[in-house]
Amino acid sequence: MPWRTLTVNQQRQEFLALAQKPSRNLGELCRRFGISRKTAYKWLARDTTEDQSRRPKNSPKRSNATLEAQVLAVRDAHPAWGGRKIAHVLMRDQQVAIAPGTVTSILHRHNRISPQAGEAATPWQRFEPPWPNALWQMDFKGHFGLTDNSRCHPLTVPDDHSRYNIILQALPNERREGVQEALSRAFVQFGLPERINTDNGAPWGNSGQGGLTALEVWLIRLGIRLSHSRPHHPQTNGKEERFHRSLKAEVIDRHRFCDLTQVQQQFDRWRYCYNHERPHEAPGLATPARRYRISPRAMPRELPPIEYPDGDVVRKVQQGGWISLHNVEIRTSTALTGQPVGCRPVADCDGAFGLYCCHQKIGEFCLSDAVKL
């Protein structure tokens, strides 16, 4: 499976962006990136990580045609970018001052944007967590064919607060094993989020009491809270949907790929640009890397033991996902087979219990409605 492999300079840039945060722990950051403190200090001491451009910063005699060519060059390189982003990047990178409205007019005049694009680009009004790693979104960007007759299933995980892309992985399928391995690598480098939100599809959705999959049980045992989007409500995952539109417009629709290795190479290049160069309108045109910091919750070497508070009735889940409580059989989830679950009495409701896997409430049941033994 083609795991993403950053160049030395990309790794250095990603490290430096995170190392310059006021609250960063340099030793922990070095461990997660697999570099020594000596290397970290050497990188931090350098004035730049690449040769600086020799392009003149100002050109007062620039013609209108030249200005339009610069706008179109940025748009052609990033087809999903609009007037505000292009104007911001031209000023930031080339010291070219141009109004966003002028950029939009140029794009319309050169047929780079359709009259309907403004309506399609209207953003959802959505909740934003107050800090990084409070919420990660996770989903697959559909799948597309490769010239070797295989298919690519892009796994995407952005941080909801900063829009920083944590995972962009080209997978051959949507099975648990590939997703869990990609998450494990991300947890080692970036730490654990407080919560992950997904839709209700495989491999993270299931039906029935508890509705858990093996992947979800693993995430819960790591101390991560889980939530699911409401069916047929894409605005719940609006930032993930927007990320997918950009990925499709700027990468998937612009290339024909031979195999997963080639896809991953292009994904890595685009991911770096998305995190470190692309301004995002919602957080004041800052790049995601400017707003992101790694989680202080490190990935544990082993899964912690499962514990429940006093007052819970603990039962071990038997084959088929069943537990027994007061001579009554309760169905949980087959993914919990062999694991202890907590049955927590519901206040002011005799015979009713909340069903818990570690910290996560996975359902409720009433003894009067269950199957008596």
Please identify what each model-predicted range represents.
Residues F15, L29, A40-W43, Q70-V71, ...:
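Mobile genetic element proteins and their domesticated derivatives, centered on retroelements
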Residues L26-F33, I86, L90:
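Short alpha-helical "recognition helix" segments of helix-turn-helix
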Residues A65, V96, G101, S105-Y164, ...:
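Mobile-element integrase/transposase regions
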Residues G208, L215-P300:
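Charged alpha-helix within mobile-element recombinases
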